[in-house]
């Protein structure tokens, strides 16, 4: 490996770490804002939306975005998003038996300030994103419907309303949007005949009266990838991987596909205490490396009692408030934002600012798989001694993350406080 390739990989790892930090910090902030509701969002999608803003930002606004995303420059950010889109977010279709992944970023501005040609070209070439001019000032509802129609087209009608009514107005200057859909089958599907209904204890947890009755749980007698830590356990459920993707260079096509295949997994972080979710997520947010450092080892272990609830979550709305709490403020300020590399100057003297970042995610987990539009003390045993069975019973609130393991990209994240609620 030459020095240039080593430097590129170092930059890629740094931004990947920034994505993980964004994932756990957003999970913390969004969860705190809605403690009694299930949560689903795509950190990678939000990361890509902010990258689109960075492509048109300058000065302190650009510096602030880069700092939140863990990138040293716009070029590094564009390279990371492009490479991730080609690998982690590549649709491995039914033909390859891999996950179905649909990802569509887009950016819209008001007609009074059209995009600069250089920005339009950059987001198309580097992010494969649509850059569109609409009339927010005079035809706001028409603009909203146009953006939602884009989302329907981009996701094959899987996501239909990225922008709900009244989410944009005549004062809106720019909207950044992302639509993402994921459908993957478990590497080892659960047997539907083993599914049984049992109580699930909500976040207030203490008594049987607080339990949600008759929640369907998936169960299995197979070995599972489970790690036991101080105060919590982690389960990793892998999705079926696609057939190996041969390096293009071996076919004479040139280029680098960034590894031979993608490998997705869902990690469930289950606190020991029924009311321990909030504290666990705060621990994760305090140190970005926490998530990947606590993932289970590659080899499965025997399990005793094992239950994971089926669930479906649909979440949508603005993520601006949470991002402001993470220190990203200048892009959303009408007085201070510097997006001068994005749109033409209309002579008004008012700087362009990001009016909103709307985001929607849909996740469903069942027996077949998933549909989705800190110091550690580990007890080691000699290899000749079989480990004792581990119980993993997710009968109270837990956090989950869908990760593409080859790139470490956190594609989806959230928490479940009540599997009976969508």
Curated annotation (Swiss-Prot):
Role noted for this protein: Probable serine protease inhibitor.
SUPFAM superfamilies named among the record's database cross-references: Serpins (SSF56574)
Region (RCL): 369-393
This protein's record includes keyword Membrane: no
Origin: domain of life: Eukaryota
Residues annotated as site: Reactive bond: 383-384
Pfam families: Serpin
Keyword annotations of the record: Protease inhibitor, Serine protease inhibitor
Listed name of the protein: Putative serpin-Z8
